Amino acid sequence: MTRSITSRMQITIKTTADDHRIAKLAALAIGLHLIESIVPSPLPGVKPGIANIITLYVLYRFDFATAAWVSLLRIFAGSFLLGHFLSPTFILSLSGGISSLLLLAIAVKLPKRWFGPITLSILAAFAHIAGQLIVVRLWLIPHAGVAYLIPIFATAALVFGIINGVITAKLLADNH
């Protein structure tokens, strides 16, 4: 007798401890992202990026690959849960996330004496904003006037980069 098409098929996916760790950390980052999404922003487009604390923490506690997975899973899952997947909001989040990850991939190799969590948080925040503003300028608002937003967003990146960096440094100090 031949097997029916509708017979049960078992698919087994083997997961590792690293997979479970990434899933837990991504879930934490997604939760922070969702909480942040319900808090009203004083300026449109300006958010503190508290989920990035998790990414930076993971970068220091584990490695770049784990941090990249956590960041990208947060961007994709957060956009699905908030209904933004493939929208301009998603594209902006992804461009900012990729920009900051690219910068962190380089910055993590710099001397830790001068490039600690606060410095990397500030640099990543600036890279995030730069990536987003480039997409805005090239795609959403192809006008030179977008440059007038740079001081506002740069100030926000500096302030929130410092705050998130201090929180990350505190978390790292508490866990060592």
Report each predicted region and the residues it spans.
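Hydrophobic transmembrane alpha-helices
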Residues: 3-57
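Short helix-perturbing small/polar motifs within transmembrane alpha-helices
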Residues: 10-14, 22-25, 31, 70, ...
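Hydrophobic alpha-helical transmembrane segments
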Residues: 19-24, 53, 57, 68-72, ...
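Structural signal for membrane-spanning alpha-helices in multi-pass inner-membrane proteins
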Residues: 29, 33-36, 59, 78-82, ...
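Interfacial aromatic-anchored transmembrane helix boundaries in multi-pass membrane proteins
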Residues: 33-48, 73-102, 149
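Helix-loop interface residues and adjacent transmembrane-helix termini in multi-pass membrane transporters
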Residues: 38, 61, 111-114
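Generic transmembrane alpha-helix motif of multi-pass integral membrane proteins
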Residues: 50-66, 103-107
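Membrane-embedded alpha-helical hairpins and interfacial helices in multi-pass inner-membrane proteins
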Residues: 85-91, 110-176
